[in-house]
Each structure stands twice: as structure tokens, then as C-alpha cells.
Amino acid sequence: MKVRDLLPVELWNNFEDLNAVPRPSKKEERVIEFIKNFGLNLGLPTYVDPCGNVIIKKPASKGSENQKTVIIQSHLDMVHQKNADTEFDFLTQGIQSYIDGDWVTAKGTTLGADNGMGVATIMTLLASSTIQHPSIEALFTIDEETGMTGAFELEKGILEGEILLNLDTEDDDEFSIGCAGGIDTNTSKLYKEEKISGGIGFEIIVKGLKGGHSGMDIHLERGNANKIMNRILALALSYNLKISQIDGGSLRNAIPRESVAKIVVDSKDFLNQLDDLAAEIKSEFFKSEPDLIIEVNNIDSITHGLSNIDSIEVVNAIYSVFNGVYKMSQSIDGLVETSSSLARVILNGGSFITQSLQRSSLESSKQDIAKTIGASFLNIGADVEHSGSYPGWAPNTDSEILDIMVSLYKNMFNSDPKVQACHAGLECGILNERYPGLDMISFGPTIKNPHSPDEKVNIASVQKFWSLFVEVLKVIPFKN
């Protein structure tokens, strides 16, 4: 069976059509055109705002004209991650998906189910002539994964809906009614390289980690390639370490899976000590990271790098950076309140750069952890920039659409849904600032390992999610 044969057929075919269009964050030109043409070909009012968001409006079905207008929202962009041994160009190639047991996944890359399943769901609704629904305002935003630019720059006054259904939650028995805000902390310092003569050159590679979403997966105690690499570099300090290059992590909102460093030390005894350290690190992560690999290669071509003194400073700075769960919520059991992820560590030509992302459902705690991270680099004279701050979404337990969907879920599936906030940056908080008073909820099919090449979406959950989506459109409340 092929992906296009799965049920509901229309939804899966729209997903495959979407995945044939390259759509990495900040490179959404082709998918914007694709969605715009999709709406125009259906004869529906279609508008692309100056930022690149696409809005398609569909009149209510006969008999549903007096129901409240519903905004249905998903983001067009996807995280572009691939395995080190996968040859793939996200700018020119479509995602190659396939069925793996109960799941759909991709060949060596992210699948794009985040948030492609949401986009495909909206497309299926827009194209349907049989689904009963109120007036629909389909909102396709851009650049959610690298700054939520589309949500931030969405024009005011072009949407009239009172209810917003966000389709970016990744568990089919969960309703999200709140989310974390976030802020980026970027640091830089330029060192003067020195000529390296003598010593022994090595390339150190940390790979095989699971990675994942630095918000939703931060509590799973997965390894951070940048922090693991730094432990190796710290060991090398005893052998007159001189760092030439570091390239760790890839995306600001993904847990780093790989890191590569080129270094010079003054003794091969370092290798014996590294074997012991590698064994210790693997034992620490034996359950959460069973495929962790620490690889060492001899190289003779290292001619320039940092001095030993500057190498010590870099290692100590990275060591001092907090990474992981900072604080758990005191109001919702099991919810991460505040966290930080050291996403990128780069050293090249003497330029030392880090990128990290702090998240919190509390604005005060978000600012606190961001300043904590920044202080680690201010102490070495680095430039520190905090940017891209976006608000969280405060839960509303009195939400009308929440009550409707909880009741509907119980009747359809004979069980209670999980109602909770998530430790990730949904666009709902920003959209609520642009359009105050929206009654919002987020739901979706079950997606595992988003933001990594292990991303997969559960087939049965897609059908479950779709059936719930169709039914809720029938029971949207009437206008006041």
C-alpha cells in the first residue's frame, strides 16, 4: 500500500501533493504559490498578505450560515533536518514519504507532518462539497519554525472569525489550551587565531543522537551534542588543547544531534582518556540515547586555531550554559514551565557563535533564564543579543469551544481527552495579540520525533483526528 491509498484518501493525497513542494522555513515562496493557486482553482476568495500568509475564505454550508465564523490555522513551513549520510536538497526536492508499519515517515529526512498534516486537513475541507461547516477562514502562516514571522506580521482587520482552531498539536487524545513563549539568545566573540605547529590533530564527531523538538522533547533527557562535545573538549584541556573548529547543531528549535570539532593536543594519551569518558557518557544515556556514537579521526591539516588560553575560555563558557528543564509548572502537573536548549555552537576562523532558545509559560521566568544564559557569555566579553521574543498563550478553562470539543470527544471515543498546555511555541499566543478575544484550541494527529529525521505520523490517529475535525464543524455555536 502507498501513502496515497490511506484513509481518508483526500487528506493523504493533499499531504503528498504538499510534500512534493519544497517548503523550508524562510524559503516558502513555492508553497505560498501552491496554496494560493489551490484556493483560486477552487474559486474561493484567496489573499496573500504582504508577509506571505495565505488566507482563503469559504462560505458556510446551507443551514450553517448562522454559526460563528471559524478561523482554521496551520503553518506552511517545515523543519529541514536530515541524517548525515542522507543526500537531499530541501530547496529543490520533495519529501519522500513511505509507510512503516502503523506510521508514515520519510527517507532520511524530516517528514513535514509538523505542520503539513494540518495544512492538508484544511485543504481537504476547502475542496469538499459534502462536509457541513460554518463560514471558514483558512489561515496558512509562514515561518513558524524560525521566528513565527507570519503570526507576528499578520494584518489586523482581515479576519472576522470568533473561534480559532489551530491544528498544530501532536497527540490525538490531547487538546492544547495554552503554550510557552520563547526568546532567542545569540552570542558572538571574535578570537585571534594563532599558527599551530606541532601537536597531534584530531577530528572528534558526536553523532547518533535522537534530537527532536527542543520544547516538546526537552523533558525526555536526550543528549545534547553540543554539551557532550564540550565534555570531550574539557578532557582535552589537560593535553594543551587548541581548538580549530566546532560545528554543532543545526536549527535553533531542535535538540542538537551532531557536533564535529577539530582540535590539536600534545599527547596521544588523550585517546586513552577519551575512551574512558566516552564509555561513561554512553552509560549515562544508555536508555535515552542507545545509538550515541563518539568517533575520533586523525588529521594532519590543522594549521590555525585558538590558543590554549582562549580554548579554555570557550570550554568554560559552554560548560556554564544551562541546558534542559529549568523549572516545572506549579499549576499543571507534569508540564515543563521553563527550559533552555543550547542549539548551535560554531567556531570557525576565530569566530565563536552560539544560539540558544529559552521557553517558558511565564514571561518573568522566560526573561530570567534568558538573562542567565546571556550572563555566561557576557562574563567572557562576548556580544549577547536577545531577539525573537514571543508571548505564551494563557489557558482559558472556561472556553466555549473547549467545552464543546471535550463533550464531542467523549461521545465519539468513550474516553476523556487530555486538556493541557504544551511546552512549545504555538502561534496562538501571537494570534491572540493580533486578534484579541479569540476562543482558541489546538489539536491534531499523533506525531512523534518532530524536527528530526525520525519524525513520523500515526496512520490511525490521522483518521481519528479527521473524524473529530469534521464533527466539530457541525456543532460550532451560533452567532450571538
Label each region the model flagged.
Residues 8-11, 330, 337-352, 357, ...:
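Zn-dependent metallopeptidase/amidohydrolase metal-coordination segment
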Residues 217, 224-227, 231-246, 383, ...:
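Active-site-adjacent substrate-binding region
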Residues 102-105, 145, 153-359:
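Midchain, well-structured core segments that form catalytic/ion-binding scaffolds
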Residues 156-157, 222-239, 268-270, 310-319, ...:
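His/Asp/Glu-rich mid-to-C-terminal helical/loop segments that flank catalytic regions of hydrolases
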Residues 335-424:
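Substrate-recognition/cap regions that form aromatic- and gly/pro-loop-enriched pockets
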Residues 2-102:
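Acidic/His- and Gly-rich active-site-bordering loop/insert found
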Residues 76-78, 110, 139-147, 168-172, ...:
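Acidic, glycine-rich active-site loops and adjacent beta-strand->loop/helix elements
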Residues 64-140, 144-146, 151-155, 161-162, ...:
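Active-site metal-coordination/substrate-binding segment of hydrolases
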